[in-house]
UniProtKB/Swiss-Prot annotation, chain B:
Name of the molecule in the record: NADH-quinone oxidoreductase subunit K
Disulfide bonds: none
PANTHER family reported for this sequence: NADH-UBIQUINONE OXIDOREDUCTASE CHAIN 4L, NADH-UBIQUINONE OXIDOREDUCTASE SUBUNIT ND4L
Top-rank taxon, per record: Bacteria
Reaction(s) this enzyme catalyzes, per UniProt: a quinone + NADH + 5 H(+)(in) = a quinol + NAD(+) + 4 H(+)(out)
Membrane topology type: Multi-pass membrane protein
Gene that encodes it: nuoK
Sequence similarity: Belongs to the complex I subunit 4L family.
Membrane-spanning intervals of the chain: 4-24, 29-49, 60-80
Major site of localization recorded for this protein: membrane
Annotated Gene Ontology cellular component terms: NADH dehydrogenase complex; plasma membrane
Enzyme class: translocase
A GO molecular-function annotation: quinone binding
Length: 630, 100, 170
């Protein structure tokens, strides 16, 4: 039975091959059926696996030994334990819903087969990432999802902004992946194993080992954990490698929903949770993770306050929420982090798909200040969007409340000195989150329409193929919070240690509810009751507003520090000097040399018969003389 | 008694003169005649070897040599004829089509 | 035969053959060259006679003089070579040719000075034993030679044929 779980991986791969090879020659209907059915097949088999895991079993199976060389044994195998089961459910279920949504969203697009092929390839890569039982499969899936992200962000490659965004995503990802690879190498050198089950018992033995770099002794486990975290920073768009995610909104909206909300960007969190024995042994690494997460979440939330592009606001919201997940992991409450990952997949995908629905109705317009009063014409979209916004704001009863609360309680109650500070930052961010999410809701769906009447006439509710997934996700957003993931994950994820009495949990809960409600009320006041306040606020704090609007000028900073010098070196030095002079000199010079030599030798052939005869005789004489002398 | 080396010297002299003539003259037909001189020099050498080793093999070889020389003269003259007919050139230093 | 007479005849042949061959290669007129070649061939036939090879002498006269030389004369006649006024006889690089040739000759002389001369010479040779040798030991080369002659005949005809282009027009 166990070996059939490879079908979870094979179905999307088959879908990819089918659509990329012959998708062009068949009708779009067949393409969409192939794409959706492959993921459905994965989901069904995954449900079987999850059922087995529910009964307490862990599935491990090696399919094929890839590299077998002395100490290095790398195999394709999968490990399905509770953590993998959670991720499997998220990827397959949300992925399936998004495939169905895409059928309606991408209808009529000329690249239809290519889209579904890449989407299937992405699901395959993500599944390989979560199901792998060794670091090599993790890395393989890691790189592959980055690649698919590049494909899908730059899907409409004729647009320069889209292809630039794809390149940016891939390059920034690569920078993180470099650290990730170094971490894997360092780990391998010290434990000589790559399977999780082989590595984890050996980690305690590495405690206290140090690595000598330029005279400083750095603790080995901390170094490994930090290097691995580099990859997570790149993949999950935390500071300082967050710059690719807002630009990634150039891709189709279902792509944003799947990749940049539910699955790929959460791979970093999954990695930290999966490798928690390593992180658990290094206080410094955990601190770095937590503080990075906290700072990122606050930082991204502030940017989201003033943006006008609906998808961009939701993108910054994603960055902020992943920051929460890293806060959870950094506080050694990995279960809470994964729990938030799980609920976040539902409500964030819902937000993105709602935005896609609005885009569909507004003929591609995304500026919320060009919309307004849409709730009358798009009731289903409005209600699902409302549910998602309530969830993200942490209103009790919805799933976001449970997961966010776990994280904030873990931050508050941890024994670490910075715990309370992170809790404070997290609570303020929760208020900001509620504010900007309801800002979208109130500006776009309430009030009066700010465009022309013809556009308003065009606004319509999306077809059922797009709204049914919205409804399913909305239902999910509400109910999944009641299933306690951290409890489910206990066999593989250690429970956090709480240093505060349990009664204070109520206080923390109340504080976060107050923060959320405050955010909603302020947003309501500014955008519904008195709609001139926002303009006045912008003018009064114009300096702050400008910085926030320009995203703290991070892109410009990177362009100045890294991009322009690299381009300068490439053009001036490499192109002018090394390429033209040296390499082309050699490549052109060798034929020239041969030619000149040939020109020198050419006059020997005169075409005169008797001259050849003289040469022959001379040759014979010399030859005979040589023989006779010997 | 004339020693063998004298006949061989005679053959060598005739051969060299034929060789020099082949390399020097411009006329194609004279070149072919010089080839004939060379052939005859070699025949003399073979015949003298046959005489001095009292072995008839040398004479058989001269027979073959004469026959082959005749064939070669035929073909050579045919080629020269075709050349002169097609290009009007009958001097060897004007035929330089195979120049490098 | 008297050794002295032999030596006189040898000296005569040496000088005459040398002068004749030089005359062949140095004549201005091609017909003169051809006739010098004729006398040369007859002298060579005489040498064959000296070497007790009468059959070779006859064959030499019949084939070479009567066949090859006649062919040369016919070819010269057919080609209709117009004698240009003061056309050059020698190629430009004749000096190099002369030097190489002399070197060759010098090399041969040095080498051939060391050849030893055996004592027992051929007393007489007759066609009978020549024929026996030809048809037993050297039968294969004999047959192949017949093929060669056939091919040379065909080849000569084909190469020297007048093409239809040559027939008309010119």
């Amino acid at each position: 039975m166990e070996k059939y779980y490879i079908l979870i991986l094979l179905f999307p791969l088959a879908g990819f091959l089918f659509n990329i090879l012959i998708g062009r020659f068949i009708s779009p209907k067949v393409v969409s059926w192939a794409g959706v059915l492959s993921i459905l097949g994965s989901l069904v088999v995954a449900l079987f696996a999850i059922a087995q895991v529910f009964s307490g079993k862990t599935i491990e199976y090696n399919i094929y030994t890839w590299i077998l060389s002395d100490d290095l044994k790398v195999s394709f195998g999968y490990l399905i334990d509770q953590l993998t089961a959670v991720m499997l459910f998220v990827v397959c279920f949300v992925g399936w819903l998004i495939h169905i949504y895409s059928v309606g969203y991408m209808h009529g697009d000329p690249g239809y087969p290519r889209y579904f092929a890449y989407l299937n390839l992405f699901v395959f890569s993500m599944l390989m990432l979560v199901m792998g039982n060794n670091l090599v499969m993790l890395y393989f899936g890691w790189e592959a999802v980055g690649l698919c992200s590049y494909f899908l962000i730059g899907f409409w490659y004729h647009k320069k902004t889209a292809s630039d965004a794809g390149k940016k995503a891939f390059i920034v990802n690569r920078i993180g992946d470099f650290g990730f690879a170094l971490g894997i190498f360092l780990l391998f050198i010290n434990v000589y194993a790559l399977n999780y089950t082989d590595i984890f018992p050996k980690i305690p033995g590495l405690q206290g080992h140090t690595l000598n770099i330029f005279g400083w002794n750095i603790d080995l486990i901390t170094l490994i954990a930090l290097l691995l975290f580099c990859g997570a920073v790149g993949k999950s768009a935390q500071i300082p490698l967050h710059v690719w995610l807002p630009d990634a909104m150039e891709g189709p909206t279902p792509v944003s929903a799947l990749i940049h909300a539910a699955t790929m960007v959460t791979a970093g969190v999954f990695m930290v949770a999966r490798l928690n024995p390593i992180y658990g042994m290094s206080e410094i690494a955990l601190a770095v993770v937590a503080i990075t997460g906290a700072v990122t979440s606050f930082f991204a939330a502030t940017i989201a306050l003033v943006q006008r592009d609906m998808k961009r606001i939701i993108a910054y919201s994603t960055i902020s929420q992943i920051g929460y997940m890293f806060i959870g992991c950094g506080m050694a409450a990995y279960g809470a982090g994964i729990f938030h990952l799980y609920t976040h997949a539902f409500f964030k995908a819902l937000l993105f798909m709602g935005a896609g629905s609005v885009m569909h109705a507004m003929a591609g317009e995304l500026d919320i200040y060009k919309m307004g009063g849409l709730r009358k014409k798009m009731p289903i979209t409005y209600i699902t969007f409302l549910i998602a916004s309530l969830t993200i704001a942490g209103i009790p009863g919805f799933s976001g409340f449970f997961s966010k609360d776990e994280i904030l309680w873990a931050a508050f109650a941890s024994a670490k000195p910075y715990g309370k500070f992170i809790w404070l930052l997290g609570t303020i961010t929760a208020a900001l989150t509620a504010f900007y999410t309801f800002r979208i809701l109130f500006v776009a769906f309430h009030g009066k329409f700010r465009g022309t009447p013809e556009e308003f006439k065009h606004v319509h509710e999306s077809p059922p193929i797009m709204t049914v997934p919205l409804i399913v996700l909305a239902i999910g957003s509400v109910i999944v919070g009641y299933f306690s993931i951290p409890h489910f994950l206990e066999p593989v994820i250690p429970k956090p240690v709480f240093a505060a009495p349990h009664e204070q949990e109520r206080v923390v809960m109340t504080m976060s509810i107050i923060a959320g409600v405050t955010g909603i009320l302020i947003a309501g006041y500014i955008y519904i009751v008195k709609s001139t306040v926002s303009a006045r606020l912008a003018k009064t704090f114009s300096g702050v507003y400008k910085v926030l609007w320009n995203k703290y000028y991070v892109d410009e900073l990177y362009s100045f520090l890294f991009v322009k010098p690299t381009l300068w070196i490439a053009e001036k030095f490499i192109e002018r000097f090394a390429d033209i002079k040296i390499i082309e000199g050699i490549v052109n010079g060798i034929p020239k040399l041969i030619y000149k030599t040939g020109l020198l030798i050419r006059p020997i052939q005169t075409g005169q018969l008797q001259q050849y005869a003289i040469f022959m005789i001379a040759g014979i004489i010399i030859f005979v003389l040589i023989i006779l002398n010997i | 008694m004339i020693p063998l080396s004298w006949y061989l010297l005679l053959s060598a002299t005739l051969f060299s003169i034929g060789l020099i003539g082949f390399v020097i003259r411009r006329d194609l037909i004279v070149m072919l005649m010089c080839l004939e001189i060379m052939f005859n020099a070699v025949n003399i050498a073979f015949a003298s070897f046959s005489y001095y080793n009292s072995n008839l093999t040398g004479q058989i070889f001269v027979l073959f040599s004469i026959a082959v020389a005749a064939c070669e003269a035929v073909i050579g003259l045919a080629i020269v004829l075709a050349l002169v007919r097609n290009t009007g050139i009958n001097h060897s230093d004007e035929i330089v089509n195979l120049r490098g | 035969m008297n050794p002295l007479i032999e030596q006189v005849f040898y000296v005569y042949f040496f000088i005459s053959l040398t002068i004749l061959s030089i005359a062949v290669i140095a004549s201005k007129n091609i017909i003169h060259s051809a006739f010098f070649l004729l006398i040369f061939l007859l002298h060579v036939a005489a040498i064959f006679l000296f070497l007790n090879a009468e059959f070779l002498m006859i064959i030499q006269i019949i084939v070479y003089v009567g066949g090859v030389l006649a062919l040369f004369i016919f070819a010269i006649m057919i080609m209709n070579i117009k004698e240009e006024f003061r056309h050059k006889r020698f190629v430009k690089f004749s000096i190099a040719g002369l030097i190489t040739g002399f070197l060759f000759l010098a090399g041969l002389y040095i080498f051939l000075g060391t050849v030893k001369s055996p004592e027992n010479v051929l007393i007489k040779s007759d066609v009978n034993s020549l024929g026996k040798l030809l048809y037993s030991y050297y039968f294969l080369p004999f047959e192949i030679l017949s093929l060669v002659l056939l091919i040379a005949m065909i080849g000569g005809i084909i190469i020297a044929k007048k093409t239809p282009f040559d027939r008309e027009g010119k």
